Amino acid sequence: MAAKYIFVTGGVVSSLGKGITAASLGRLLKNRGLKVTIQKFDPYINVDPGTMSPYQHGEVFVTDDGAETDLDLGHYERFIDINLSQNSNITTGRVYSTVLKKERRGDYLGGTVQVIPHVTNEIKERVFRAGRETGADVVITEIGGTVGDIESLPFLEAIRQIKSDVGMENVLYLHCTLIPYLKAAGEMKSKPTQHSVKELRSLGIQPNVIVVRTERKVPQDMKDKIALFCDIKKEAVIEAWDADTLYQVPLDLQAQNLDQIVCDHLQLNCPEANMTEWKELVNRVSHLSEKVRIAIVGKYVELQDAYLSVAEALRHAGYHVDADIDIDWVYAEQVNDENVDELLNKADGILVPGGFGDRGIEGKITAIRYARENKVPFLGICLGMQLASVEFARTVLGLKGANSAELNPQTPYPIIDLLPEQKDVEDLGGTLRLGLYPCKLQEGTAARAAYGEEVVYERHRHRYEFNNEYREQMEKAGFVFSGTSPDGRLVEVIEVTDHPFFVASQFHPEFVSRPTRPQPLFREFVRNALAAQA
């Protein structure tokens, strides 16, 4: 059958949970037996978020094919349990870049290039391509930003046109809004929702479903009022309450028949979603009997979205061992030799995540040394793996001044150096070693035991790599290179002997973790952290 298209927009304010709503609907439709793909359009002019500050954007989520994308793609992958691609995150910058390249090639035959039709046609092509290349029954597209933003207008015009292109029975518009509660008046207010829908309708888009974000139950008379003023069916006003766990949201939406409303509108004849496994997950999450305290020593801890996938992967591992994860966010710049014990002695495990730049580096190295010397379970990711190598070289081998060439180009001992193919690269954007690469694991190591396989595939995002000139010297001192590229040239995983669990990877294992299938390194890290309590 031809693909069906669902467009998710947002109004009133940002951060309403459009991404979670879209991902939850995707899960419900998948569990009805439909093949679902999902994408996000971001209105900013950056080509991708790869060079944006985490303070501006949160984490950069990396797909199998190496796309640097919005963190909402992490929600999509975790909820729907699918692997997405570069076609799943499109920015204004990418659209305009493509249009300008076509203009330079002469593809427009000398015509005047305009927002309509050239930019909108390019946007529509990205929607249709997502369905074509995946063979999806349903394509869900989230439009970033808020209705009324000037940056979003070309995207909204494009999705308006798609209804004419494919027929109204093949398109559904879902609009997310806010119903605020005014504490002083003791009232909930629907007026912002009405005005948001009025703005959307002025652009030619009539929503079929309205999902209202709310702190408390919405009275039926208010839902009826929204339906009347926004010209939708009463049952198509759906509530999205604040939930104790994100994974409750699909069940809340199913309880209000959202997926059935969508299927009826799109004329999809499919069985009811079987959410038994999902209900078991939510029940498990709600009744965890243990508690594990993990210290994340990072550079951007003030904005926890910068490490969103790391935190989620820890929680997934916790679900597996029946443990609630209590995260201590430790600001790396504040860690030093004098206070490291005070900051970290309550942690059952210590994690140093990825990052770029030299701020907070010495604090991270101090935390790594503390974990190694005090036998605290440790997991390092990307930069965390590189700094674990530097710490070992400095402390155990006595190589004073050892460092990464990224952080100190004049270091006498460049334990971490540029990948050979990166030596002459000048552009920062899109030039890292990105995406899925194989890793061969050594027999008899913690990493091999965790995965239970010799060759695994993980996602990468780095420019620097372990310097093989120091490999033999560090191996003799008890440093284990437990994972490498299949040709043995690139170091992928390191470990330390005589330690309950000290493992660090050059790749980013957090990106492939799922709530029902925790990533192996995270699972073993949390399991060892729990065991350390005893």
UniProtKB/Swiss-Prot annotation:
The keyword Nucleotide-binding applies. Its EC number is 6.3.4.2. It is an enzyme of class 6 (ligase). ATP binds at residues 15-20, 72. Disulfide bonds: none annotated. Pfam families: CTP_synth_N, GATase. CTP binds at residues 14, 149-151, 189-194, 225. Mg(2+) binds at residues 72, 142. GO terms for biological process: 'de novo' CTP biosynthetic process; pyrimidine nucleobase biosynthetic process. InterPro entries: Class_I_gatase-like, CTP_synthase, CTP_synthase_N, GATASE, GATase1_CTP_Synthase, P-loop_NTPase. UTP binds at residues 14, 189-194, 225. The keyword Transcription does not apply. Pathway: Pyrimidine metabolism; CTP biosynthesis via de novo pathway; CTP from UDP: step 2/2. The active site is at 382 (nucleophile), 508, 510. One of its GO terms (cellular component) is cytosol. Residues 293-534 form the Glutamine amidotransferase type-1 domain. Allosterically activated by GTP, when glutamine is the substrate; GTP has no effect on the reaction when ammonia is the substrate. The allosteric effector GTP functions by stabilizing the protein conformation that binds the tetrahedral intermediate(s) formed during glutamine hydrolysis. Inhibited by the product CTP, via allosteric rather than competitive inhibition. Residues 1-268 are annotated as: Amidoligase domain. NCBIfam families: PRK05380.1, PyrG. HAMAP family: PyrG. Catalyzes the ATP-dependent amination of UTP to CTP with either L-glutamine or ammonia as the source of nitrogen. Regulates intracellular CTP levels through interactions with the four ribonucleotide triphosphates. PANTHER family: CTP SYNTHASE, CTP SYNTHASE-RELATED. This is CTP synthase. It comes from Shouchella clausii (strain KSM-K16) (Alkalihalobacillus clausii). The lineage of its organism: Bacteria, Bacillati, Bacillota, Bacilli, Bacillales.
